[in-house]
Amino acid sequence: MGSYTIPNVVERTPQGERSYDVFSRLLSERIIFLGTEIDDGVANVVIAQLLHLESSAPESEIAVYINSPGGSFTSLMAIYDTMTFVQAPISTFCVGQAASTAAVLLAGGDPGRRFVLEHARVLLGQPASGGRQGTVSDLALQAKEMVRIRSQVEEVLARHTHHDVATLRADMDRDKVFTAQEAVAYGLADEVLARRLTRV
């Protein structure tokens, strides 16, 4: 969150007033908000929230709202694997953007539960190399790992978009930006939303 102030929400109850930070208040409604670059710290928080919500009500929907430029592949896969591991149905919502690794999380929501708001964008691209340095042998090993990572991303996206890996590889060779409607047509999301769904 950087230097932003996290707002508090005041709730009046028969016992008096209670103050929560806004993210805790959203969590009490089974909403997880991912609004930053994905790194190990962010992944650990999101995973803990997913596991907590599953343990409290394993059959109830968890909504994951995404506005992220992407980030670490290993952190992404830790979140993605937890989303597929928990019993609770997972809805994903793209607000603003789901770029790079964050696009995989959007696509990884349960079928029929992947949404994109009407002015959001989704960006597909190759996993970043991170500007690695080292000996020629080290660089060769790093290049091999990058190819493995790219293949893993392609396989996950193929599973959720129903495109073949060759199509995904060609589309991800350079950054490819989708409007909300294009993201649905491509299979990264199921529906464009202008207004909130009635939650059940």
Curated annotation (Swiss-Prot):
GO terms for cellular component: cytoplasm; endopeptidase Clp complex. CDD domains: S14_ClpP_2 (cd07017). It holds the Pfam family CLP_protease. The active site is at 100 (nucleophile). GO terms for molecular function: ATP-dependent peptidase activity; ATPase binding; serine-type endopeptidase activity. One of its GO terms (biological process) is protein quality control for misfolded or incompletely synthesized proteins. InterPro entries: ClpP (IPR001907), ClpP/crotonase-like_dom_sf (IPR029045), ClpP/TepA (IPR023562). It comes from the Bacteria. HAMAP family: ClpP (MF_00444). Has lost one of the conserved residue (His) proposed to be part of the active site. Therefore it could be inactive. Belongs to the peptidase S14 family. This is Putative ATP-dependent Clp protease proteolytic subunit-like. It comes from Streptomyces coelicolor (strain ATCC BAA-471 / A3(2) / M145). The lineage of its organism: Bacteria, Bacillati, Actinomycetota, Actinomycetes, Kitasatosporales.
